[in-house]
Amino acid sequence: MRKLVILIILSIVCSLFIGSIESVDTSKFKTCKDSHFCKRNRVSHEVGVMNEMKSKQNFNIVEGSIKLVKQENTIYFDLQEQNQKSNLLTMKLEIYEGGIVRMRAQEKEPLLNKQRYQVQDVLLDTIKTVPIQWKQEPSKQSNTFSFKHGEKECCYVLVQLVPFKLDVYIMNELAITTNSDNLFHFEPISDKPQPLPPKEKKSEEENKEANQEEDNNNNNNDNNEEQQVSTEGYWEERFGSHQDSKPNGPMSIGMDFTFVGSSHVYGIPEHTTRLSLKSTTGNGINEQPYRLYNLDVFEYEIDKTMALYGHVPLMISHDTKKTVGVFWLNAAETFVDIEDVTTPVSPSKKTHWISESGIIDVFYLTGPTPSTIFKQYAYLTGTTALPQMFSLGYHQCKWNYKSEDDVKQVDNGFDENHIPYDVIWLDIEHTDGKRYFTWDNNNFPTPADMQNIIGAKHRKMVTIVDPHIKRDNNYYVHSEATSKGYYIKNKDGNDYDGWCWPGSSSYLDFTNPEIRKWWATQFGYDKYKGSTPNLYIWNDMNEPSVFNGPEVSMHKDAKHHGGFEHRDVHNLYGYYYHMASADGLVQRNADQNDRPFVLSRAFYAGSQRIGAIWTGDNSAQWSHLEISNPMLLSMNLAGITFSGADVGGFFGNPDAELLTRWYQAGAFQPFFRGHAHLDSRRREPWLFNEPYTTIIREAIVKRYSYLPLWYTTFYQNTLNGAPVMRPLWVQYPKEANLFDVDDHYLIGDSLLVKPVTQQSCKTMKVLLPGQSVNEIWYDVDTEKPINAGVIEIDTPLEKIPVYQRGGSIISKKERVRRSTYQMRDDPYTIRIALDSSKSAQGQLYIDDEHSFDYKKGKFLYRQFTFKDNVLSFSDASNKSSTSYKPNVTIEKIVILGVQKPHSITCNITGKEKLSFEYDSTLSKLTIRKPDLLVDTDFIIKLN
């Protein structure tokens, strides 16, 4: 009977997700007006209390509290809310290497039994403060003081005492102001008030006076509204049928930041709006603020500020003079308002950040260029983990491949249709009743053999492992987790019990490092029976998703390690789960020398150090194909570079044209995976017949040919944090016409891509940037040179608009193979596109494509330079190993935009004279079979 009840409940829950795929049910998810902490903080046009809030929220620096502790490179002072005698805050100001300013604020003397959560494990251990110098010392005669970097001129900070305000100056120009609108808000930790004792019976006269007072209050609508905003939801809060007990009461924080001189801000992924973030308030705009709260949104809508699966609280501002940023280090639910402000002097972007709990911990990234912003953010949170080469190939996924025979047929289908691919994926149905680390023995009786058959072709398999653990005492993971007390607790201290795919489920507390270590051991070959070294992992549902929880997630009053509530750590949960899973893949091998591959849906700042991310449950609609580019660009700006969107759309059934265009777009996005819902029809690349099979094959083959570029660009990210997929303005920061462009993008600094994302598109306009520097672009298909500017092109179905920048040198591998492994020893083709000065340069990175040996110097990082008709090839890094000598050659060199030489000579013995072909129509020179080793320096002269 109990099993029947469970099945009925599961069918109802699943129908909510599987049956309704037209659009997301927004009633299940909160907006600012549903979150009392947001209403209390927000300068709301709905309530109209802006002036009242401003007058109440002034914070002042306490006189005599300012001190510079040189041993700590830190300035301390106390803050006190105006007209308040208690609830002192303490603030710390620091400058870090690279010109990063940090501001932290919390209670000076919090209650002994309560504490605020401070984000752990996101910042790198290597970050260091630098000495601070007074620029203007504090004094009784002045309402301001200022300080600067003690070792170099990059920026300085001006602090106003009454009311508190902090301004960041870059190159002596005001860049970011803090609390200029007096929206600094800090709800002090307090104990819940005890109910008042029963009142004695009042006299008739006292009752009359009380009634008259109540009438007077009711007549004052403004006061009633303000009181409602100020006090509602302090100690409990309801949403739908769910109650949040809020045992710690109100603990929200807020702050405003204005980006001076800016009209464009970017970042704070993940949302479905355009790359340049839209205003949510001011000038008659009535939008919900951007929400940052990781949620399982089973089908999302376009152009919405609602929360999705992962978030990074980083905002970047860019104008023609500077690029700056704010990183708000807080893991609780957060809202961000954006407002355009235009003054006679310059535009500005005002932003208001509100979090439910935690401390104020803000990093000011002072830039002042795009490249320095990326370096500064990477300095704090790290760069992208260098992926294995196979993970940059094509991945084939479906919910679900039904059996070992089904897997075999799909695998053979790629070979029969001559389409390369690297990874086949298994969704939740491969398990024994959604018990992860197990197999459905009826359909997958010999999983190790299945993986070995795939592995014999040098391909990989990925299985899904979600964080919800089926509550079954016969399931070893659950029984051990229960006995060790490893589950998150509910508000009453019992193991949290929620519903997900397995039915009744509990959730491990990954904020506890002991539990993360234990989880990592579950991936050992002795624990994960049937797994092999060819098996990698997919983490889904890790926001976390709880079907019967508030907003399809966990109750905020659930209890975590250290006594913190789930509300404090929510946005870190998926990050920690992703981390523990990746650690498990490393530790399962004795030598611990295999780079992990773990795809995650949830993410936070620092997730780039762990593995790949995808944009979640999109739909087979043209609008979802179109928005995938802005979404991925936003993620790349925030460090999440190894990211992609499900090709074809997860929900629904794309027609042949949409699927083809999506493959073409996905081939030029960092993570390239086809995926589909359980109820979607099969859509393997060959199922739509001709001409679609051929065109899709060509798109995938083109992806594989550019893998040396992708791999090199990912390596360069490990050096400088630069996005792999980047907006045009990153490369051309002074061209204001590019600041809104998000349907074109660059791969590294070399390829410009504008995917076709409109149905029945026959022609389209392409914006080729760089007019101010006389940039030249080359169509990669026709090889014709095109001057920078707007052009109109034909877009037949087989056309992918891709252009190589003049001045770049790209390495390719053009032999078609089954998978990336077979390409390892293939020779390179070098494509040189000359700029208007007849020069070009580029890099090539090579290692063993799978291990951590590159960290020991076992790699080649090579530099190509073409100038004055001379091509030189040399080491681009003094860290390359002199002993690492891959037996790989260069078999062809193509130079575009060059005059025909009389002869070509090389300084390598036996290669002194090289043969060539010349196409005068294209000004194209081809050197065939130079057969030069990639580990050897050489010089080629065009005479």
Swiss-Prot record:
GO cellular component, one term: endoplasmic reticulum
Record GO terms (molecular function): alpha-glucosidase activity; carbohydrate binding; Glc2Man9GlcNAc2 oligosaccharide glucosidase activity; glucan 1,3-alpha-glucosidase activity
Glycosylation sites: 878, 887, 907
InterPro entries: Gal_mutarotase_sf_dom (IPR011013), Glyco_hydro_31_AS (IPR030458), Glyco_hydro_31_C (IPR048395), Glyco_hydro_31_N_dom (IPR025887), Glyco_hydro_31_TIM (IPR000322), Glyco_hydro_b (IPR013780), Glycoside_hydrolase_SF (IPR017853)
Region annotated Disordered, chain positions: 186-231
Pathway(s) served: Glycan metabolism; N-glycan metabolism
Enzyme Commission code(s) on record: 3.2.1.207
Highest rank taxon of the organism: Eukaryota
Keyword match Nucleotide-binding: no
Compartment(s) where it occurs, according to its Swiss-Prot or TrEMBL record: Endoplasmic reticulum; Golgi apparatus
Assigned protein family: Belongs to the glycosyl hydrolase 31 family.
Name recorded for this polypeptide: Neutral alpha-glucosidase AB
Lineage, uppermost ranks: Eukaryota, Amoebozoa, Evosea, Eumycetozoa, Dictyostelia
